[in-house]
Amino acid sequence: MGGERVALSPGMATYRRTRRRVRSRRSTPRGYTRIVTTPLDPNLPARHLTSTKVVAVRGVQLEVRDDIVVGEEPLEIRAAGPRQQPVNVAVTMRTPGFEQELAVGFLTSEGLIAGNEVTGFEAGDPGFMAEPDDAIVVRLAKKLNPGIAKPRNFVATASCGICGKASIDDVAVRCEPLPKGLPVVSRAVILSLASTLRAAQAAFDRTGGLHASGLFEIDGRLVVIREDVGRHNALDKVIGSRVMAHELPLWDRILMVSGRVSFEIVQKAAVAGIPIICAVSAPSDLAVRLADRLGVTLVGFLRGDGFNIYTHDGRIDLRELMGVG
């Protein structure tokens, strides 16, 4: 049915009015047909998103209809040096797509390899009833780091990337503090990041069920965005894409994430050399402490025309608000 296009609020989807106007942030409003304008990456597998039947209850009305849900499958990450048998490193629950980036980003951000060690990839045997790309072998130029070869109990869930590590020592990747005097970014650029990231979230538009990580130039231009059911996976895919492009360290980039900031997000960003992390939601206390120690600028609650700077505020140019310059 035709009708006017109604923008519900900045950063939200546009809907076509069919009956009466209702606002909603979490699902298609009753009386509207969702219009998705951001195209999906053509490199994504069909399993990235799937269709399922739902019984939708809206007030006193119900409807049986198709709904789009995000894919979630295990990925077994293995690694092997020259003339070595692959070693199982981790199993992570992820949204299918960009498996090579995820594997390389994971190994790099966990401090297990350096980016220039990767020589190629092989498909692993995922076992019974798994998809062919549910296991990947990362081939390395030199023999395995002892940190990879030691026994591990490493199962990363979508919500907890560090769950199941063998010891507390495994949680803290040793990372040197970032150099001081890294880029200073304008307030206007910081304020633009959330809406730019949201506008590029093609899969979220269809499901409402994905986290996103975006890497930006210091002038606010989006370099790469990745979406995944796990926030740490989305970041690993971003980091992996830059490792494979031989761009690390990322000292002149900004990271924007769609949710909260945990210890692990700060750790992974710092390993990649990212000096500024921005988030729509709050950081944890451990994330703040780690960012402070590693010299990372941490920005939270980036919404509308405001944000909070938790650490190393010198990288955000606030002179106009202070009547200076």
Role assignments for model-derived ranges:
Residues M1-I35:
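N-terminal amphipathic/basic-hydrophobic helices that include classical n-h-c signal peptides
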Residues G3-E4, M12, Y32, V60, ...:
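Intrinsically disordered, low-complexity regions
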Residues T14, V22, N116, A172-C175, ...:
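Amphipathic, positively biased hydrophobic alpha-helical segments used for protein targeting
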Residues I35-S213, E217-I225:
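Intrinsically disordered, low-complexity regions enriched in acidic/Ser/Thr/Pro/Gln residues
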Residues T119, C175-L178, P183, M244, ...:
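Hydrophobic alpha-helical segments
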Residues C160, R319-E320, V324-G325:
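Phosphate/diphosphate-binding glycine-rich loops and adjacent basic-rich segments that engage nucleotide
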Residues A194-S258, E264-I265:
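A mid-sequence, solvent-exposed acidic-amphipathic segment
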Residues H232-L321:
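Feature captures the catalytic cores and cofactor-binding loops of soluble hydro-lyases/lyases
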